[in-house]
Amino acid sequence: MYDAVNAGKMDVILGYSTDGRIGSYDLVMLKDDKRFFPPYDAAPVVSDKLLKETPEIKDVLNRLDGKISTKKMQELNYQADNDLIEPAVVAERFLKENNYFEGE
């Protein structure tokens, strides 16, 4: 879809606001002022088993709350999808740049 709109074969497409290709194709996201589309908010999800075995993981993961903007997520996704950097490497770089491991 992104290639098609970039090539002028389409004028409008539906995509995720965090897709890294939005910036790479210089596309414009329209504001959904009618709230037609449900919000897509990423959230950590863990099993009850993991939470019981490692209760401290809750606080560790909650430190990410509100730390990744849509723009930043686009950049991170672009690195993984376009630059073909392993997602684990992209994530580790982000965490280090934001002092996530500080004090550990």
Language model region names:
Residues 16-18, 48:
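Short secondary-structure boundary segments
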Residues 15, 24, 39-41:
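Active-site lining segments that contact anionic ligands and/or coordinate catalytic metals
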Residues 55-103:
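Ligand-binding clefts/hinges and TM-proximal coupling segments of bilobed small-molecule sensing domains
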Residues 41-54:
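A bilobed periplasmic-binding-protein/Venus flytrap-type ligand-binding module shared by bacterial periplasmic
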Residues 1-13:
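Short helices/loops that flank or line small-molecule/ion binding pockets
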Residues 10-12, 40-42, 57:
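A short pocket-lining beta-strand/turn micro-motif at the edge of beta-sheets
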Residues 7-10, 21-35:
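Ligand-binding "clamshell"
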Residues 36-37, 63:
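A detector of mature, structured extracytoplasmic domains
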